[in-house]
Design a protein with these regions (language model features):
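Active-site anion-handling motifs in enzyme catalytic cores
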Residues: 1-284
Length: 284
């Protein structure tokens, strides 16, 4: 079964699960970079396409809002991670006390973080995982399930977003992390500041972020959702995992053998050879 058939299967199953809920609230105003906006946009498109009615509640109001007959729907996130867990697990705990049910849409989880385990262990919390490693780590905690990341439900081919004529000779778009998610510094390297564009931090809206990717033929990145967008926009993707197997695990589950002609995993030495990264002493 190819990616598109599997996506439809997961989309229909997820919508069926959500439709069983009444008085649905969607969590909004979540902290994150522009890449996270792709998840939120895909989530809204999923709900609208399924004719699911929902109200919105900002993340800052969850702790002080009692909706004992309502369900809170939390968009997928990477904020259950060792590096970023300062707000979302606490939000889940507060919501589990104030809402009848809490559904966490497909996310990645790090169960080495105690507050993550505590939040997912609440009896009325239903977490979805977006890749197999996370699912296997949480399935013993609660009502866990596996599903495609909602970013994959985003429609990149809406009217007005058709591809422009792309210059085949244009240099690849280099998008290497410049935040705490990058381990380049611990290995003595940094992104080449002359050519690196960490668009998840530097663009101001999702449309601009997508346009940056749309207007090239090749993307080199260690950012997950930059990679997802590149693949679904038909670009050549060259990626490296920022830590662990973050992108590799996700791509293996989501894309399987689909798009294998578009996706290439690279190494630090390859990035060095192409001057995409520099030793820190040369970049000081």
């Amino acid at each position: 079964m190819d990616f598109f058939a599997r996506r439809k299967l997961y989309r229909d199953a997820l919508l069926s699960f959500i439709r069983a809920e009444s008085d649905l609230y969607l969590l909004t105003d979540m902290p994150g970079n522009i890449g996270d906006h792709l998840i939120c946009a895909g989530t809204r498109e999923l709900l609208v396409s399924g004719n699911i009615r929902f109200k919105c509640i900002p993340v800052g109001k969850v702790a002080n809002t009692a909706r004992k007959s309502s369900t809170l729907l939390i968009p997928g996130s990477g904020a259950f991670d060792q590096r970023w867990h300062e707000w979302l697990p606490d939000t889940v705990l507060a919501a589990s006390n104030n809402f009848r049910r809490v559904i966490i849409l497909p996310s990645s989880y790090d169960v080495s973080v105690p507050i993550v385990v505590k939040s997912l262990s609440q009896r009325n919390v239903f977490p979805f995982a977006r890749e197999v490693k996370s699912y296997l780590s949480i399935k013993h905690l609660n009502h866990a399930a596996l599903c495609f990341d909602c970013a994959t439900f985003f429609n990149f081919n809406e009217p007005g977003t058709t591809d422009l004529r792309v210059d085949e000779a244009k240099a690849p778009l280099l998008v290497l992390r410049e935040d705490a998610g990058s381990l380049l510094g611990t290995q003595g390297y940094a992104p080449n500041p002359v050519i690196n564009q960490d668009i998840s931090l530097t663009t101001t809206c999702l449309d601009d972020w997508i346009t940056k990717i749309r207007n090239v033929t090749t993307v080199v990145t260690d950012r997950l959702h930059v990679g997802v967008a590149a693949v679904l926009l038909g670009k050549q993707l060259v990626y490296i995992d920022p830590y662990g197997e973050k992108l590799s695990t996700y791509f293996k589950y989501t894309f399987r053998e689909s798009f294998k002609d578009r996706i290439t995993r690279c190494s630090l030495s390859w990035l060095m050879e192409n001057k995409y990264i520099l030793p820190v002493k040369e970049n000081a």
